[in-house]
Design a protein with these regions (language model features):
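A general structural signal for short secondary-structure junctions and capping/turn motifs
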Residues: 87-90, 117-118, 178-181
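The catalytic-center signature of Zn2+-dependent metalloproteases
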Residues: 121-188
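Propeptide-to-catalytic entry region of secreted or membrane-anchored zinc metalloproteases
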Residues: 1-92, 131
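Catalytic zinc-binding patch centered on the HExxH motif and its immediate surroundings
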Residues: 104-124
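Active-site-proximal beta-strand/loop segments in catalytic clefts of secreted hydrolases
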Residues: 1, 99-105, 130-132, 154
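Extracytoplasmic
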Residues: 91-95, 123
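Short secondary-structure capping micro-motifs at structural edges
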Residues: 82-87, 112-116, 137
Length: 188
């Protein structure tokens, strides 16, 4: 990672956070705090994430979490522990972790199985590549915003995802699915 790359990633993530904050109703106080662990020893792993499939994430995420001092449980449990610490530090309601993988020297800017950005519904983390499959670093804010939606239980909206209009979380249906929803809500 160069300093310029790290700075650009930080700026793009902040722009994505600001986009979400700008959508909050006036009565809501939505803000984000960004903590960065950019010490090279923390992010060092014996695996090259970009050369592996997404399904191998546990190998390198586990090492990174151990480097951060989280040594107990699965890699998901370790990330949950970090997120709980982040919530406490920021006095926040929620926290999630972002892993950004440097794909600068990778020809297709994707993991071995074609993934380039993903998050788990409800968290605890998302993974993005630097170039985001041709969206480019200049559009990382949009990719981040999309994946953040998944962290907070938003489903995919594009037709090829297999989304359904009746998918719901907390009783709110996925009306931005491109597969013929009644309300046809806009999506990112």
């Amino acid at each position: 990672w160069t300093s310029a790359q790290k700075d650009k990633v930080t700026r793009e993530i902040i722009m994505g956070m600001n986009w979400w904050a700008s959508l909050a109703p006036d009565a809501q106080n939505l803000s984000f705090a960004l903590y960065s662990f950019s010490d090279p020893s923390v992010g060092r792993t014996s695996y090259e994430p970009i050369k592996r499939p997404q399904s191998d994430e546990g190998l390198w995420i586990n090492e990174i979490m151990t480097n951060l001092g989280y040594t107990s449980g699965s890699y998901f449990a370790k990330v949950d522990s970090l997120n709980n610490w982040l919530k406490s530090e920021a006095n926040a309601d929620e926290a999630f972790t972002i892993f950004v993988v440097n794909d600068y020297n990778d020809a297709d800017n994707k993991f071995a199985d074609g993934y380039f950005a993903y998050a788990y519904l409800g968290g605890p983390f998302m993974v993005m590549t630097y170039d985001n499959d041709g969206y480019g670093i200049a559009n990382m804010d949009a990719v981040f915003a999309h994946e953040t939606g998944h962290i907070f239980h938003a489903y995919d909206e594009y037709a090829s995802s297999g989304c359904e209009c009746t998918e719901s979380y907390n009783g709110c249906q996925n009306q931005n699915c491109e597969n013929g929803c009644v309300d046809d809500v806009c999506c990112i």
